[in-house]
Amino acid sequence: SHYPYPFIDGKFDSTLFPLAEWREASRLSLSVADVVDWSTGSGDADDPMLLDQIRTKILTRRGIQARRDQILVTMGTQNSLYLISQLLAHRETVVAMEEPGNFVARELCEKNGARVVPSPVDEQGLVIDGALAEVDVAYVTPSHQIPTAVAMPLERRQALMESAHVHDFMIIEDDYECETSYMDHPLPALRSMDKEGRVVYVASLSQVLAPGIRLGFIVANADFIESARQLRRQVLNHPPLNNQRAAAIFLSLGHYDALMPRLGRIFRERRMRLRGALSNIRGIPLEISPEVGGTTYWVRAPRDFDIAKLAIEAERHGIL
C-alpha cells in the first residue's frame, strides 16, 4: 500500500536526489580519458581521484587529515562495519556498545564471538564511566547518536579520548549524519582528536546521495587500512570504479558542497512541521530529542502509553 507519510528507518526520499548534478558527473566520467582510468583495472586500489576528493572536500570539514593510504572505499557503512568488526571483534574482545544503539553493529560484533557490553546513553551521548576500563573496543555515534539523535559535546568527546588513552581501547567512530547538523560550527570528529591511532572512522556518501550509490569509506592508520583492504579483497577488489569516478567528479564540481545546505534546510523545515504536529497531540506528555540535525526524530512517551494503538490510528491517516 502507498502511504503519504512513510516513517521507515532508512527509507530514501528520491525527490531529494541531485539528479541533474549526478547525471553530469556520470556523463563526465565516461570521457575517453576517464574510461581508460577506471576500466583498465587497478588491482585492489581505489580511485585516486575519489580518495583525494574525500581528503579535501569531506574530511577537512571534519577536521581530519589523511593520506590516500589511510582511506579505504567501501560499499557503505554496513560494509565498513563488517570489515572493521572482522578485524577488531573476536572471542577475546569486549566491545562497549551504545544502549540504545545501532543493532547492526551489535550483531556484527556478536557474530564474531565478541562480548558486547551495553553502555548507557544520556542527553550528551555515550556515558563515560568506569565500565570502559574493561573494554577493548567502543562503538560510538557522536555526531548524531543512533537512535536518540543527541550530539556528543566537545567535553564528552575529550573525556572519551582520555578514557581510551588511559584504558587502552580502540574507538569505532560512526559519523552518522554528520553532514546534516544544524550547528553553525559542527563539532570535530573524534578521529581529528586522535594522536595515537585509536580511532577508526566510518562515513558514507550513500546516506547523503542515495542508498543505491553504495559508497562509504573508512579512515584509519595505514596498517589497519591495509588489513581491511586484504579482507575486502576476499569478496571484491574494490567498489565499482565507474561509480567511484562519478562520485569523485560530483565532489570536484562542488555539487556535494551545494547539496549539504539544501538538505539541511529541507530537513529542518520537516522537523519543525513534525514537532508542531506532535505538539498538537493532546493528553500525551511527549519528550522530544534536542534539535541537532539529521533525519531522525526521537520521541519518548510514558511507559504505560499504548504505542500500538497510536500506530493503528496513524495508519488511518496515511502515516506508517
Predicted regions and their residues:
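PLP-dependent aminotransferase class I/II
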Residues: 199-280, 288-289
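Conserved PLP-binding active-site segment of the aspartate aminotransferase-like
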Residues: 220, 298-305, 320
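Conserved glycine-rich beta-strand-loop-beta hairpin in the small C-terminal domain of fold type I
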Residues: 101, 265-275, 286-300, 307-313
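N-terminal "arm"/small-domain region of PLP-dependent enzymes with the aminotransferase-like
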Residues: 1-45, 316-319
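Short, contiguous acidic/charged loop-to-helix segments that flank catalytic cores in large enzymes
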Residues: 121, 147-151, 233-238, 264-265, ...
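Conserved core of the PLP fold type I
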Residues: 26, 30-168, 172, 179-180, ...
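Short glycine-rich anion-binding loops that position phosphate/pyrophosphate groups of nucleotides
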Residues: 12-13, 142-146, 207
